[in-house]
Amino acid sequence: LLPVAENLIDKFGKKLKDLEEFGKDKIIREFSVEYMMKVIKSDLKSLSIEMDNFFSEQTMINSNAIETALSTLKDKGLIYNGIIEAPKGKTHTDWEAREQMLFKSTKFDDDIDRPIKKSDGSWTYFAPDLAYHADKLKRGFDVVIDILGADHSGYVSRLKAVINAFAEKRVEFEVKLVQLVKLIKNEKVLKMSKRAGDYILVQDLLEEVSSDFIRFVMLSRNNDVPLDFDIDLMLSKSKDNPVFYVQYAYARINSIIRTLKISLNDQISINAKTFQPNEYEDKIIRKIFEWPKIIDSASYKLEPHKIPFYLFELSTLFHSYWSKGNEDKK
């Protein structure tokens, strides 16, 4: 937050002191959000990640999108004022019965009906999420994919209820839960803490490892599996470094192309009757023919990790073939 504060002072100087508390808070909040969004967009650009749209929760609140979405649900009889049951495993003294505005999510197989507005009149965290998904459907999406942290798994059922309430099962909805990434250096996990303010920033990581390495490694595990990102390993030139291993295979293949003075676009004729691939060639050819299926499966099942897996397997076969060639010059 120190860079935010420093830039805030540079822009406004002592003017902030003369403002009333409400006006001061508004300026600080808006400036901080704008500054951090610039940082986020810059980091994404450094990783060659393009976002078509950034959606502001505040604009949704200002445009009364929550009220509009709730009006639609009220017309369907899915909003009411009531008291939710006490949470399981808690004593009566830990819970106070208060009437709240509730969304009848149990109608769509959720565990309990979800609060939309608190007894003090303020919105719950769920209210903007409800309106946001309603807005997505208004924009004409027939497939909606949410990416959530694994610690938000309890949110899945209520979000499915929202989609079904608005779209009436006319829209395909899927939630991908993403596990945490552990950064490792010198065989030690780099610990991060919100309270202590200890973070490893994307730019810090980019100073150590290239964006290509980061992108490849981040895609090399299924989203629901925790990922250990070993910085030292990513800088090594060994088979244990999957990025280097794939790049090395690519470099070797290009060296063959240069030696033979051919182009990838050249037509190569093979006589199926006389061509007899050896064991290594047969495995490589079979693996290459898997590529279209890998692409289809990765896109259809939303599992991009299958592509790095495939590239590593293909590279392994090629390196084995290369080593065999060094042993047998024929």
Regions found by a protein language model. Give the residues of each.
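Non-catalytic interaction-recognition regions
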Residues: L1-K330
